[in-house]
From Swiss-Prot:
Keywords tagged on the record: Disulfide bond, Lipid transport, Lipid-binding, Transport
Organism of provenance: Triticum aestivum
Secretion signal, residue range per the UniProt entry: none
Family under the similarity heading: Belongs to the plant LTP family. B11E subfamily.
InterPro entries: Bifun_inhib/LTP/seed_sf, Bifunc_inhib/LTP/seed_store, nsLTP2
Disulfide bond positions: 2-34, 10-24, 25-60, 36-67
MF terms in GO: lipid binding
Function (record text): Transfer lipids across membranes. May play a role in plant defense or in the biosynthesis of cuticle layers.
Name of the protein: Non-specific lipid-transfer protein 2P
Entry annotated with the keyword Transport: yes
Lineage of source species: Eukaryota, Viridiplantae, Streptophyta, Embryophyta, Tracheophyta
Length: 67
């Protein structure tokens, strides 16, 4: 199930470009199928589409989704 709240541990990485934690990467991996849904969400979309979000995904070894 998609739970955007699980991405809260990634907030500092997504907002400031800080190195993501292991917990952040694990949660991103689990939520990966939901990224496009989040990108379209008015609340979360601006964060998911930000350059730092891309960097965070790449730091975790995850592909940046093409929605």
């Amino acid at each position: 199930a998609c739970q955007a709240s699980q991405l809260a541990v990634c907030a500092s990485a997504i907002l400031s470009g800080a190195k993501p934690s292991g917990e952040c990467c694990g949660n991103l991996r689990a939520q990966q199928p939901c990224f496009c849904q989040y990108a379209k969400d008015p609340t979360y979309g601006q964060y998911i589409r930000s350059p730092h979000a891309r960097d965070t995904l790449q730091s975790c070894g995850l592909a940046v989704p093409h929605c």
